[in-house]
Amino acid sequence: MNKEALVQVAEEVRRATGLPVGWRDVERTLGALRATRDLWEAVRLSRVPLRFLVPIWEGLARRGLLRVEEGLDLLAEVPAPRPGEAACPACEGRGLVGERLPGRAAERFLAWAKERPEAIQDFDQGYVTPESTLARVALAWNWGDLEGKEVLVLGDDDLTGLAAALTGLPKRVVVLDADPRIVRFLERAAKAEGLPLEAHVHDLREPLPEAWVHAFHTFFTDPVEGPLGLQAFVGRGLLALEGEGCAGYVGLTHVEASLAKWADFQRFLLENGAVITELRDGFHVYENWGYIEQMRAWPWLPVKRRPEKPWYTSALIRLELLRRADLENARVEGDLQDEEATY
């Protein structure tokens, strides 16, 4: 397929779905299919949102280029570049390893992580590997965003707050999570380890209590990636930061977020005085969750097969404030997980 044909496929998908699909999305889709016939690996390698991939696959099948049976099989040679995989095996491409955190933080965290509550769909949960969590905390340590700092974690099925507290570096760690199981688990771990860690049940659609507004130096969050979810999670994080020089760590995917959404997110940050200082793609690797057949995307998939290895990843973005973010501390109305609102 030449570029003209790629553009044609993208335009057809845009007309049929209203999604901002570009010709590079089609090219990356084809490149991933050159590398694998496994649906989940194709999702990971393409870096294209799943909502885009399904209609692109359908368009390729109509053209006789793709056969969908037990896997995704290309039926013709295409000039799309095959995605390279040259990540360092020691750090899995992250550029740092959590095992170098101070003291016994990594050892103690790995022990506690084995006891964490199971991810459930009620709270749209899915947790990253322990190595991903430790590496995230290590990056914050590298930037001086832990030692002596007040740290806030917004949603914590990954146990980032626990990993940070176990380093012995933060002055205080506060975790907000809607799942009472997570809160009880963190309270038990904090008591057993003697940590300056507190956890609270809090629905991020609700305003932050005034005591938490402009009260922290660092926040961590992996937001629900619908437009309202980004507003609720990242907006609350910015509002919680004290002001200039404070930092946030945010996970953002390609599976659920198009480059158009990434652009809107970057504009949102700039409008609120935040600048991106680090962006490490594929930093977080997610464990496969047990409820995958119940996830919203399952009915769309042309091949109904559970993944055999991790496939869902997200980038880690570090942001820093140039000024205090004065966002409205109001209730966020609507469904944070609204699939039809994602793009």
Curated annotation (Swiss-Prot):
Any single biological process term in GO: polyamine biosynthetic process
Location in or out of the cell: Cytoplasm
Gene3D superfamilies listed in its UniProt record: Vaccinia Virus protein VP39 (3.40.50.150), Winged helix-like DNA-binding domain superfamily/Winged helix DNA-binding domain (1.10.10.10)
GO molecular function: transferase activity, transferring alkyl or aryl (other than methyl) groups
Keyword RNA-binding in annotation: no
Keywords from the named record: Cytoplasm, Polyamine biosynthesis, Transferase
InterPro entries: BpsA, BpsA_C, rRNA_MeTrfase/Polyamine_Synth, SAM-dependent_MTases_sf, WH-like_DNA-bd_sf
GO CC terms in record: cytoplasm
Database matches in SUPFAM superfamilies: S-adenosyl-L-methionine-dependent methyltransferases (SSF53335)
Catalytic activity: 2 S-adenosyl 3-(methylsulfanyl)propylamine + spermidine = N(4)-bis(aminopropyl)spermidine + 2 S-methyl-5'-thioadenosine + 2 H(+)
Protein family membership: Belongs to the branched-chain polyamine synthase family.
Name recorded for this polypeptide: N(4)-bis(aminopropyl)spermidine synthase
Species of provenance: Thermus thermophilus
